Every structure is written in C-alpha cells, then in structure tokens.
C-alpha cells in the first residue's frame, strides 16, 4: 500500500513539492523521485536478504515494515515547498529512499518465506499470493483515492487531502508490524546451523548465466507490471485524455481481476511447469506491449480501455504468479 499510494496520489501532491514547474514537469519530477526509490531496491534486497539469512525471515519482514512506516510518516508531515523551500523535495527523496530499501528487502524475503512454507506440490499456487498481497495494496491505495475523490474537492485534495493516505499508511504499517511479530519462523531457517546462516552472494557468482537470466526476467517483468498497473492511471489521464475518476476506476477494476488471476496461474504452473509460462510471457510481452499502449493512447471509452489493460495483465500473470 505505502509504495503504491505515492503513484496513486502523484497527480495531487506534485505541485506541493515542484510548484515552480508546469503540470507535465511536476509529474515528471514526481515520477523521477518515484524512480529514485527503485535505485535503493537492489541494495534493500541485498541488505535485508543478508539480514534474513542471519536473523531470520520474521525479523527481516518486521524491519521492512518499520522502514516503510517511517517513509510514509515523513511524506505525510513534510511541509510543502512554499514553506521550507528546497528541503521539501529533499525530505521527499529521503522518504522514498527508505521505502525503496523496505520494498527491495520485502519482495525477496516474503517470497522466500512463502516458498519455504509451501509444499513442493503447491509451491506455485502458494508463491502466487505474494502478488495477491501486492495487488491488494494497490487496490487499497486506489480505494482510498476513490473515497477522497468522492468526498473532497480537487482544491482540498491538492492542498492537504493527499496527506491523508500517507498517514493511513503509517498507521497500517503499525498494524502490520504487530501481525508480523506473531508469525512463525520457517522450518528451513530454524534447522539451518548457525554457522551456515550467511548470504550466498559468492555462490550466485558461480552461475553467471543463470544469474543474468533471472535479472533479465525480473527487469522485464517489473517494467511490465509497473507500466500496466502503477503507471496506467497517469497514462490514461495524460495520454488518452481521461478524467482522473474514470482512470482510477478502470485501474481499480482491472487490478481486482488481476489479483484473482494470480492463484489460477500459480496452480497452472504447478501442473504444467514454470518455464512454459515464462516463455508465453516473454514472447507476448515483446510482441504486444507497444501495440497495446498505442491503442490505449486513443481509447475513448471505459470498456475498450478495460479490455486492453486486461489483455496485458493476463500476459503479465504468466510472470507475476510465479516470480516469487
């Protein structure tokens, strides 16, 4: 939720930090700050992954929530550029760096936790729930946006209303922290001798081809996922000329269907294998992405936009359901 709420509300808070630019430049600067968070994700994945190998999956998942909570709280309370000048975007960048560390570690650790908890026969089905929870976070962010759009004026949303979802995120993180403190450690970690509880970076370097293959699949999958989920709302507003409300609603409905598809594709991978799904994803992703985005840019009605987005998300499900 905390990671995605930034993108969902970017249309409203961008001028609070970059008010001296025009609307397009404000969004580009806001998107650049969003991208900065991604720079910290590999570091977060390495750092929290190493922490998880030494202290346990449960401890790493708890730490990732603390980092995310701190980032959300900073964004919720930081004064705008008009009050503290350049320090406003500086604090925003710092908050996103913390959230990038959190998300980078969260993905790998949560995937490890679920795969270690799963049985071999249902590993794909179980691992698919990583993206179910991710999409639930996106849906919650869009749900908060829809409620605020219905109950507040654009003036209030642009002025101060955009802070509400970040404050909500900080509170939800506290709840998540309490829940994670009560989860069980995985059996795989508990039976591992203390002398062997260390990272495996040196082992990865012994398999460069496999490492590069995984990096390529992850880069392509992540780019596609964020394009057709996180970025789609802004694409429909800025490129297709949709209203903010229509763009938000079609994004929410398509994400709901996308979430339901994850266990189905996870179960299919248990039956037919992961490799065929990855081949379908890579082939259709390369051939279909540009035509879909080109058609979406001129889509004028809700149903056309929805079915085009869903076509892309069905292809994405071949990857997301098993990427953990």
Show which residues each predicted segment covers.
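Extracellular/periplasmic helix-loop-helix junction of adjacent transmembrane segments
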Residues: 10-43, 90
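Extracytoplasmic gate region of multi-pass secondary transporters
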Residues: 6-7, 208-258
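Hydrophobic core of transmembrane alpha-helices in multi-pass small-molecule transporters
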Residues: 78, 84-104, 303-322
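Glycine-rich segments within core transmembrane alpha-helices of 12-TM secondary carriers
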Residues: 102, 124-149, 172
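Central cavity-lining transmembrane alpha-helices of secondary-active solute carriers
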Residues: 31-50, 67-71, 252-265
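Cytoplasmic membrane-interface "Motif A"-like loop-to-helix N-cap segments
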Residues: 54-66, 271-283
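C-terminal transmembrane helical hairpin of 12-TM major facilitator-type secondary transporters
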Residues: 275-324
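C-terminal ends and interior cores of transmembrane alpha-helices
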Residues: 19, 66-85, 283-302
